[in-house]
């Protein structure tokens, strides 16, 4: 009995090996799990559920098949795919969760989230995030013709890469106070997130207990998952 967590696959047509690795993971690992949680950035970008890109239909079919075989799949939006909506969720059989969610697994209460909200030192990004998560701005963007949305998304990705290249590693990592506040706010001693692409298990000292923050790795040259069982919480890398 196990529950699996993944994040930061950044699936795109430009990286077919990662897509193949994900599909293999679904067939080899996820099919045997109690549930699969995807903690954001499943896709490199997402400009709306009406995008006819065949890759998205392929991924949706694989996830739907998983659900039909009795393995539920849950999704928390990332900073790349925050516009993924109900239409794709229904097509893929995924359940959309709030940006911070507590799950109880095998006697543990675990806070799960993408992780970008913990990076509070990156004030430029947090201001940008607040704007693009405005429901009115999202609605206006989705009204724009698909071709123009594609161009806007490409421009924003390039701008983001340029901005990040000039930022320090410290600014782009989580803020310690934000982490502790999240633990205390949700009254948990376990946390799993992605976003930073810095896989590790960290101990965090809270007033009454030592908590654990598990960071998923990105799927660049290998896969990364967290496997939670009754006995253990493991951070695992594996070849595609």
From Swiss-Prot:
GO terms for molecular function: manganese ion binding; UDP-2,3-diacylglucosamine hydrolase activity. It catalyses: UDP-2-N,3-O-bis[(3R)-3-hydroxytetradecanoyl]-alpha-D-glucosamine + H2O = 2-N,3-O-bis[(3R)-3-hydroxytetradecanoyl]-alpha-D-glucosaminyl 1-phosphate + UMP + 2 H(+). Its cofactor is Mn(2+). Substrate binds at residues 79-80, 122, 160, 164, 167, 195. CDD domains: MPP_YbbF-LpxH (cd07398). Gene3D superfamilies: 3.60.21.10. Mn(2+) 2 binds at residues 41, 79, 114, 195. Mn(2+) 1 binds at residues 8, 10, 41, 197. GO terms for cellular component: cytoplasm; extrinsic component of plasma membrane. PANTHER family: UDP-2,3-DIACYLGLUCOSAMINE HYDROLASE, UDP-2,3-DIACYLGLUCOSAMINE HYDROLASE-RELATED. HAMAP family: LpxH (MF_00575). Belongs to the LpxH family. This is UDP-2,3-diacylglucosamine hydrolase. It comes from Yersinia pseudotuberculosis serotype O:1b (strain IP 31758). The lineage of its organism: Bacteria, Pseudomonadati, Pseudomonadota, Gammaproteobacteria, Enterobacterales. The gene is lpxH.
């Amino acid at each position: 009995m196990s529950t699996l967590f993944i994040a930061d696959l950044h699936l795109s047509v430009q990286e077919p090996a990662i897509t193949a690795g994900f599909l293999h993971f679904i067939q080899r690992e996820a099919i045997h799990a109690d549930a699969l949680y995807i903690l954001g950035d499943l896709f490199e970008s997402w400009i709306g559920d009406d995008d006819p890109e065949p890759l998205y239909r392929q991924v949706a079919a694989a996830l739907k098949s998983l659900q039909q075989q009795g393995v539920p799949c849950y999704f928390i939006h990332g900073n790349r795919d925050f516009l993924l909506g109900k239409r794709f969720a229904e097509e893929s059989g995924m359940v959309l969760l709030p940006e911070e969610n507590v799950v109880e697994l095998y006697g543990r209460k675990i806070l799960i989230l993408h992780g970008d909200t913990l990076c509070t030192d990156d004030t430029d990004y947090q201001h940008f995030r607040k704007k693009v998560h405005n429901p009115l701005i999202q609605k206006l963007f989705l009204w724009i013709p698909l071709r123009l949305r594609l161009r806007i998304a490409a421009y924003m990705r390039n701008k983001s890469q340029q901005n990040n290249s000039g930022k320090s590693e410290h600014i782009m990592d989580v803020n310690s106070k934000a982490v502790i506040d999240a633990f205390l706010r949700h009254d948990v001693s376990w946390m799993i997130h992605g976003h930073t692409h810095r896989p590790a298990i960290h101990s965090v000292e809270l007033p009454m207990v030592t908590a654990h923050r598990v960071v998923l790795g990105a799927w660049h040259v290998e896969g990364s998952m967290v496997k939670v069982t009754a006995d253990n919480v493991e951070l695992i890398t594996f070849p595609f």
